[in-house]
């Protein structure tokens, strides 16, 4: 079965994984598939690209809208990596990163819990039949209406970093357990630092614990976030050390024993994850080895989402200025590529020349030109790529962007009437080679 790809569009993700049972699938894949009943067909190892081409061929007859492909095989592989590297840390996937329902479903089937930041995100998760006790409401500053909703539906674990939040929770959800969100010592290498906005300073920890104690609220533990996409695994070392100090302060105040440590997010896949896992385990052993009953959770988003999604866009316009080629595509910085601005992402494009070069759609060996790629809106800021090398392409050819799962569609807008939320996601399962 290795090297094959199963392709399906619009099916229950668990049904897709059903065909992995008995075919060398990992235990994670098998567990995710146990309730699946619908048949899927295995295809050749190149079928993922073939699948995209088949979708494009269908779209040649209609409006040629952009689309995503979600590779569930990649998600299974990433979950296996997580459980192998961090077996004692429960992932609570950060829904804000990418709330695609099929993606949430497959993560749930593989045992992930969920980090939600709003009522809407809680509703996304509950709508999939997921129990509220698998949700942490990990937003330190919540509208009162959202706290009331959390109490109503039974989401009973949340974060705080201010006295005002204590008062809101005491008033509207006194049964909720709290995690004190602290500011990490260092998050300077994160793509998106969290420290300037969230997290208690060292001198604020004791007053915030006392405030919760006076309000007769239960502080079950500590949370932190080193920042989204942090490349420096050493950031976890200082943050975990600071968390231990909070545990000790709570004990000195006579508070109930803390039982939860939330090490937040910041994880990326690949070699950086390996380094982060080593750093986290080392720090936990050093600081919390005397806490055998401690529950440790994390809030990975990018780790699971980024590499699992591929975006396909149509070339809708072209201009030639000497050697320079300029193309307009039907998604851009106000849509999925908002990650270039807000997430400091670097995007890469590969061609599928279905209109101009059908005998060599990937344009292998073709001459390339300095290229600018614009998004579809009227704003000149909407420029996806500059000084990028691409072959000669034409209107109705396609550009494909890999690694487009993290903070893309989730943060897109409908500016100029280009509706990011309407972009369709197709499902595939590519077995690891």
Curated annotation (Swiss-Prot):
Binding-site residues, substrate: 342-343, 379
GO cellular component, one term: chloroplast
Domain of life: Eukaryota
Pathway(s) this gene product operates in, as recorded in its UniProt entry: Alkaloid biosynthesis; nicotine biosynthesis; Amine and polyamine biosynthesis; putrescine biosynthesis via L-ornithine pathway; putrescine from L-ornithine: step 1/1
Keyword list, A-Z: Alkaloid metabolism, Chloroplast, Lyase, Plastid, Pyridoxal phosphate, Transit peptide
Disruption phenotype: Reduced nicotine but increased anatabine contents; these phenotypes are enhanced upon treatment with jasmonic acid (MeJA) and wounding (e.g. removal of apices).
EC number: 4.1.1.17
One GO term (biological process): response to wounding
Keyword Zinc set for record: no
Active site: 378
Function, in words: Involved in the biosynthesis of pyridine alkaloid natural products, leading mainly to the production of anabasine, anatabine, nicotine and nornicotine, effective deterrents against herbivores with antiparasitic and pesticide properties (neurotoxins); nornicotine serves as the precursor in the synthesis of the carcinogen compound N'-nitrosonornicotine (NNN). Catalyzes the first and rate-limiting step of polyamine biosynthesis that converts ornithine into putrescine, which is the precursor for the polyamines, spermidine and spermine.
The family this protein is said to belong to: Belongs to the Orn/Lys/Arg decarboxylase class-II family.
Name this polypeptide is given: Ornithine decarboxylase, chloroplastic
Taxonomy of the source species: Eukaryota, Viridiplantae, Streptophyta, Embryophyta, Tracheophyta
């Amino acid at each position: 079965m290795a090297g094959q790809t199963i392709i399906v569009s619009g099916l229950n993700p668990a049904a897709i994984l059903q065909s992995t049972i008995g075919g060398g699938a990992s235990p994670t894949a098998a567990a995710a598939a146990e309730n699946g009943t619908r048949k899927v067909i295995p295809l050749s190892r190149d079928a993922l690209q073939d699948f995209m081409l088949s979708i494009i061929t269908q779209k040649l007859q209609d409006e040629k809208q952009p689309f995503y492909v979600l590779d569930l095989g990649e998600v299974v592989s990433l979950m296996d990596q997580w459980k192998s590297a961090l077996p004692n840390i429960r992932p609570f996937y950060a829904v804000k990163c990418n709330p695609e329902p099929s993606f949430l479903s497959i993560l749930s089937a593989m045992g992930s819990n969920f980090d939600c930041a709003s009522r809407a995100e809680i509703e996304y998760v509950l709508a999939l039949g997921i129990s509220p006790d698998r949700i942490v409401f990990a937003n330190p500053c919540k509208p009162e209406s959202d706290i009331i909703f959390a109490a109503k539906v039974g989401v009973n674990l949340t974060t705080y970093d201010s006295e005002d939040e204590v008062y809101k929770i005491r008033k509207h959800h006194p049964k909720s357990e709290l995690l004190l969100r602290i500011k990490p010592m260092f998050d300077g290498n994160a793509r998106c630092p969290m420290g300037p906005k969230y997290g208690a300073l060292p001198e604020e920890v004791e007053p915030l614990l006392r405030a919760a104690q006076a309000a007769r609220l239960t502080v079950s533990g500590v949370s932190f976030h080193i920042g989204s996409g942090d490349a420096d695994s050493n950031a976890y070392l200082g943050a975990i050390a600071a968390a231990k100090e909070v545990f000790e302060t709570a004990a000195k105040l006579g508070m109930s024993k803390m039982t939860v440590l939330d090490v937040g997010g910041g994880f990326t896949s690949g070699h950086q994850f390996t380094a982060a896992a080593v750093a986290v385990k080392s720090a936990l052993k050093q600081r919390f080895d005397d806490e055998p009953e401690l529950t440790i959770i994390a809030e990975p988003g990018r780790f699971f989402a980024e590499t699992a999604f591929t975006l396909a866009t149509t070339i809708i316009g072209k201009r030639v200025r000497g050697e320079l080629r300029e193309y307009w595509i039907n998604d851009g910085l106000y849509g999925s590529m908002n990650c270039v601005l807000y997430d400091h992402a670097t995007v890469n494009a590969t061609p599928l020349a279905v209109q101009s070069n059908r005998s060599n759609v990937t344009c292998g060996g073709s001459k390339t030109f300095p290229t600018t790629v614009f998004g579809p809106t009227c704003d000149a800021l909407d420029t996806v790529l500059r000084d990028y090398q691409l072959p000669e392409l034409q209107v109705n050819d396609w550009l494909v962007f890999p690694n487009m799962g993290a903070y893309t569609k989730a943060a897109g807008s409908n500016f100029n009437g280009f509706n990011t939320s309407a972009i369709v996601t197709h499902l595939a399962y590519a077995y690891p080679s």
